[in-house]
């Protein structure tokens, strides 16, 4: 799982955003710097979704010139520069966003994710916990799962399980928490426990290639080839273009 990232800006469709600009991409003469920056942030995000990173970089560069003191502009710059693998610029932008948006738990959550992705796990974990405790943050279970993923990446499975279970205490049957606990179990060689999490997940949540893949691995671990084949067929039929389906076609089973 990737650390969840919530950008606190309104993203408009690319066509609508382009319609607000001239052919050259310049905004109308009546646009204030803040409005111009907001539109350029939207364009940067949409181009990033299309994997047109050069265009995304151009528009976020404009936004940074127009409204550098805006936390969401800096946050989006961090995302763009991270995608470009320009980590010094990404780190500077994320840190600036966190400073400017110190009272915005969504921005703090995003910064914590960046810290964890760049090896600063202790700082990221601490920040995720603070976000989860913030009464202004409406989904503390998300921050708790993120904290669990962060510490799991360091090999600390006990703390990871603790965070995932805390997330379930806030939101019973949260799909990502169940999936993460199942993955911890299968990595520990416990097929029965992993299968239990898969069954709990599927009882109340739609299937995903990730959870079906986990079910396949759990049944293989338990030695039930017939049941494993059922999960394999579901992955191939319901999610034929998924990474998991491709791994199955390549003969990868773990």
Language model feature labels by segment:
Residues 42, 76, 110, 144-146, ...:
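Canonical tetratricopeptide repeat
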Residues 15-37:
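Bacterial Sec signal peptide processing site at the extreme N-terminus
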Residues 27-30, 34, 205-254:
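Terminal, low-structured helical/coil segments at or just beyond the last alpha-helical repeat
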């Amino acid at each position: 799982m990737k650390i969840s990232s919530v950008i606190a800006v309104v993203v408009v469709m690319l066509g609508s955003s382009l319609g607000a600009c001239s052919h050259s991409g310049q905004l109308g003469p009546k646009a204030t710097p803040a409005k111009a920056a907001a539109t350029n942030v939207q364009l940067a995000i949409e181009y990033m979704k299309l994997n047109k990173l050069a265009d995304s970089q151009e528009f976020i560069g404009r936004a940074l010139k127009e409204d550098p003191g805006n936390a969401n502009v800096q946050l989006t710059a961090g995302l763009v520069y991270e995608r470009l693998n320009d980590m010094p610029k990404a780190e500077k932008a994320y840190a600036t966003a966190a400073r400017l948006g110190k009272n915005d738990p969504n921005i703090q959550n995003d910064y914590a994710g960046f810290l964890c992705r760049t090896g600063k796990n202790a700082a990221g974990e601490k920040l995720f916990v603070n976000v989860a405790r913030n009464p202004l943050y409406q989904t503390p279970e998300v921050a708790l799962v993120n904290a669990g993923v962060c510490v799991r990446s360091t090999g600390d499975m006990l703390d990871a399980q603790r965070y995932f279970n805390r997330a379930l205490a806030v939101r019973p049957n949260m799909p990502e928490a169940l999936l993460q606990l199942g993955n911890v179990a299968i990595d520990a060689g416990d097929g029965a426990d992993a299968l239990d999490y898969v069954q709990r997940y599927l009882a109340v949540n739609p299937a995903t290639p990730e959870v079906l893949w986990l079910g396949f691995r759990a049944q293989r671990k338990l030695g039930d080839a017939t049941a494993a084949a059922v999960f394999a067929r579901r992955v191939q039929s319901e999610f034929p273009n998924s990474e998991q389906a491709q791994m199955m076609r390549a003969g990868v089973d773990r």
